[in-house]
């Protein structure tokens, strides 16, 4: 059997990734729950770096936890990435030279690697139970929660035989090197883990099943990953992966040591780490509310990176052209929903008119205002109304409430309480004057409507301009605030507009 020191010496000479090595990054989530913004931010940064460098993004699935993994979650991941336009070069659904890309289908590959690690003396059988480890710590006056103590590293053949005779089952542990482990984090700079601070760790269960601690780096090595870009919560696992990579190089599985970069935590309200349970962490909730991919990608990019100190708004193309993992900040990034909405609003206003109109349809459909196929009249209303709200909303989900009155029948307008409260005492007089002014109009244009109402209500009745059109707005839309009134009346047409004012007049 190779001694630990010999093994460490043989395996520590693994070459580093050099500047000529084509960039290969990966996104490797577990299919559990619904996609959250922290996970998608990780996918985005990997994608942006791959596209910026002309490299490749590999998308694989870590689905070895059968109790928690689900096909529903897997398809939600696909949905999320496709909606955002985050595409991948190799992986699930698209294939590639390193298939299969689901860990649950790679069992034979892992068993082959395990056999080589055992033959090379990089792993050893560990029979100690958690209770025994804790008891040894207590007996030595140490904290019983220190973790594994290395007891099984140097078991004699007699001790091994005795444990086997007792019917014990062994896990396999990787030998950690007896030296400091230092690496240069692409985000945080040089980091050192002192010798002895990370105990030998289990890589294979007693039943022979490989653990995540083994399969994740093995997949990275076999797929030639050059840059491991992941969340800060995985920083503490890096020394174990460095040690494992040395062993994988020694047995011919790894070609080089990848570079590591740990992305900052995403914080929520009260400067607490954003939890999956926090509403703002749910990607699909943001989509339902009306975020568009361009706006959300822009904001997620700002969670640890920026185009420049004074430039918060940029396109996906600008992100790709400028993104460098070395520019990512290590400080925690706070998810500010108000800022996210404001940025989204800017991108909504940047959409071409036809594109904006088409993106409204699913939200109008979800609200029940249009069917699966729009009628010609609904198409006409939407084409004329969309420009009226594009400058006034930050989320697409705000549009149905603003446009509802245009799609409703004249006798289906419900007057909101706040609109009713603001009506003047002489409401009937105002509405009678409005009707008298509107009925004679021949060419039903916004300009003619405004001129007629201004003369009747402001000039003749002496109502202040700010309050003059409120009763008509309420009659037309049922709301105190609506898209531009005169343009809305043009969309409805003269007959419908007059019918609504008469109905409200009673």
From Swiss-Prot:
Cell compartments where the protein resides: Cytoplasm
Pfam families in UniProt: Anticodon_2, tRNA-synt_1c
UniProt key word Protein biosynthesis: yes
GO terms for MF: ATP binding; glutamate-tRNA ligase activity; tRNA binding; zinc ion binding
Residue interval(s) of motif 'KMSKS' region: 273-277
Record-listed E.C. numbers: 6.1.1.17
Domain of life: Bacteria
Record SUPFAM superfamilies: An anticodon-binding domain of class I aminoacyl-tRNA synthetases, Nucleotidylyl transferase
CDD domains named in the record: GluRS_core
One GO CC term on file: cytosol
InterPro entries recorded: aa-tRNA-synth_I_cd-bd, aa-tRNA-synth_I_codon-bd_sub2, aa_tRNA-synth_I_cd-bd_sf, Glu-tRNA-ligase_bac/mito, Glu-tRNA-synth_I_codon-bd_sub1, Glu/Gln-tRNA-synth, Glu/Gln-tRNA-synth_Ib_cat-dom, Glu_tRNA_lig_a-bdl
Main location: cytoplasm
Reaction(s) the record says it catalyses: tRNA(Glu) + L-glutamate + ATP = L-glutamyl-tRNA(Glu) + AMP + diphosphate
GO biological process: glutamyl-tRNA aminoacylation
Keywords noted in UniProt: Aminoacyl-tRNA synthetase, ATP-binding, Cytoplasm, Ligase, Nucleotide-binding, Protein biosynthesis
Annotated positions binding ATP: 276
Residue window of motif 'HIGH' region: 29-39
Assembly, per entry: Monomer.
Function comment: Catalyzes the attachment of glutamate to tRNA(Glu) in a two-step reaction: glutamate is first activated by ATP to form Glu-AMP and then transferred to the acceptor end of tRNA(Glu).
Family according to the record: Belongs to the class-I aminoacyl-tRNA synthetase family. Glutamate--tRNA ligase type 1 subfamily.
The name this protein goes by in its record: Glutamate--tRNA ligase
Organism the protein comes from: Paenarthrobacter aurescens (strain TC1)
Lineage of the species this protein comes from: Bacteria, Bacillati, Actinomycetota, Actinomycetes, Micrococcales
Gene giving rise to this polypeptide: gltX
């Amino acid at each position: 059997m190779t001694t630990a020191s010999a093994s460490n010496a043989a395996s520590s000479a693994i070459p580093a990734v050099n500047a000529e090595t084509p960039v290969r990054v990966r996104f490797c989530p577990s299919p559990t729950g619904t996609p959250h913004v922290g996970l998608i931010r990780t996918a985005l940064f990997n994608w942006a770096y791959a596209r910026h460098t002309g490299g490749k993004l590999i998308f694989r699935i870590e689905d070895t936890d059968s109790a928690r993994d689900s096909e529903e979650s897997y398809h939600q991941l696909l949905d999320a990435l496709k909606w955002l336009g985050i595409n991948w070069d190799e992986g699930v659904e698209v294939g590639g030279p390193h298939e299969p890309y689901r860990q649950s289908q790679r069992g034979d590959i892992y068993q082959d690697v395990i056999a080589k690690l055992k033959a090379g003396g990089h792993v050893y059988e560990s029979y100690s139970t958690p209770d025994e480890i804790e008891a040894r710590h207590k007996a030595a006056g140490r904290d019983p929660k220190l973790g594994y103590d290395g007891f099984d590293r140097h078991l004699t053949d007699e001790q091994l035989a005795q444990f086997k005779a007792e019917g014990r089952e062994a896990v396999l542990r990787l030998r950690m090197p007896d030296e400091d482990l230092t690496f240069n984090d692409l985000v945080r700079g040089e980091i050192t883990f002192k010798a002895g601070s990370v105990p030998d760790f289990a890589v294979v269960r007693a039943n022979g099943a490989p653990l995540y601690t083994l399969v994740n780096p093995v997949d990275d090595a076999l797929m030639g990953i050059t840059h491991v870009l992941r969340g800060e919560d995985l920083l503490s696992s890096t020394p174990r992966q460095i040690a494992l990579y040395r062993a994988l190089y020694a047995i011919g599985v790894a070609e080089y040591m990848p570079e590591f970069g740990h992305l900052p935590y995403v914080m929520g309200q009260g400067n607490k780490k954003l939890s999956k349970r926090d509403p703002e962490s749910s990607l699909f909730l943001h989509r339902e509310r009306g975020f568009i991919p361009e706006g959300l990608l822009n904001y997620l990019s700002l969670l640890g990176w920026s185009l420049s100190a004074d430039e918060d708004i940029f396109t996906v193309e600008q992100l790709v052209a400028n993104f460098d993992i070395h520019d990512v900040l290590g400080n925690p990034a706070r998810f500010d929903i108000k800022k996210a909405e404001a940025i989204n609003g800017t991108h909504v206003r940047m959409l071409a008119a036809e594109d904006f109109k088409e993106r409204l349809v699913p939200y109008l459909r979800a609200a029940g205002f249009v069917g699966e196929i729009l009628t010609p009249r609904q198409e006409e209303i939407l084409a004329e109304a969309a420009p009226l709200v594009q400058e006034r909303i930050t989320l697409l989900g705000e549009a149905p409430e603003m446009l509802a009155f245009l799609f409703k029948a004249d006798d289906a307008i419900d007057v909101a309480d706040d609109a009713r409260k603001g009506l003047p005492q002489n409401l009937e007089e105002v509405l009678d004057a409005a009707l008298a002014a509107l009925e004679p109009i021949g060419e039903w244009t916004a300009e003619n409507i405004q001129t007629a109402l201004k003369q009747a209500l402001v000039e003749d009745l002496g109502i202040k301009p700010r309050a003059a059109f409120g009763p008509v707005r309420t009659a037309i839309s049922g709301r105190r605030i609506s898209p531009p009134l005169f343009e809305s009346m043009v969309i409805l047409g003269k007959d419908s507009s007059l019918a609504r004012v008469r109905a409200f007049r009673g």
